[in-house]
Structure formats: C-alpha cells, structure tokens
Amino acid sequence: STPLYSSAASDVYKRQMLDHETVSKYDWEAKACRPLATFDGCSFNNGSKSNPCLQGDILGDWREEVVVRTADNTALRVYVSPLPTPYRFHTFLEDRPYRLSIVTENVAYNQPTQPGFYFGAELERSGKLFRGYQFGK
C-alpha cells in the first residue's frame, strides 16, 4: 500500500492508501479501510506490486495526483481530487526531499512519497504560518 495525501478539507493531514487499483481511507470507528475510488479501465505496473505510472503532487496544489495507463496502453490518465480544499499550501514540489522521493518511488525503490517536513494534525491548531498558509487559532 502507498499513502496518498488526503484532499478532503476535513482530513487535510490524514493520508489515504493507494493499494493496487483502489484508493481507500481508514475508518477509525469501524477499524477498517473503506474504498474511495477505483481506476476502472486502467492497468498498473510491476505485476503483484501494482504501481501507477506516477504518484505525487505534480499539479502543484499540495495534493497528490495519480497517473496510470489505460488497459489497452493507448493513453495516460491523470486522476485528481474532485473535492475542493480551503487550504492553500505551497506545492510539495518545492521540497527537495519530496521531489527526490517521487523519483525514487517511480524509477527505483518502491516507497511512498515523503516530504522533508512534518505534516501533522497539530499544525492546524498551532495558529502558525505553514508553507505559505496562515492557520487560525
């Protein structure tokens, strides 16, 4: 499973899971993963590892996109979040460790993208400036 940065406004710091052709979210009350989206008509790479062609904040709005190929290998699809977000963070691509983790994930060692900074729930309550966004108290 590969974590994706969430795009729902209420879940800004919770990562979703990309596992094979499904994006899921962990339901703490039910203690189970719930599917959010599937990539119908698409094929992933590397057999049992089932990797997308690319995963990362490629459009520059801090949320991660997934690039996959169609099952007939005639096109690429870029999947983006349809959910609006009130957060306006600087793109994760400005962070060198994050850029390097995209390269590592997609051309070599299969590990999820990682930023070079802490991105946790406490930030929202901090009232501090974070990557160009001012949190309220």
Where on the chain are the PLM-derived regions?
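Calcium-binding loop positions in Ca2+-binding modules
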Residues: 62-63
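Hydrophobic beta-strand segments that make up the repeating blades of beta-propeller
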Residues: 15-20, 66-69
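Calcium-coordinating acidic loop motifs
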Residues: 57-59
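Single conserved hydrophobic/aromatic residue that forms the stacking wall/gate
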Residues: 1-9, 13-16
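Repeat-based blade/solenoid architectures
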Residues: 6-10, 42-54, 96-136
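Hydrophobic alpha-helical transmembrane segments
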Residues: 26, 76-80, 129-134
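Loop/turn residues immediately N-terminal
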Residues: 21-24, 73-75
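Surface-exposed loop/turn elements that mediate protein-protein interactions on large endomembrane-trafficking
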Residues: 22-42, 83-86
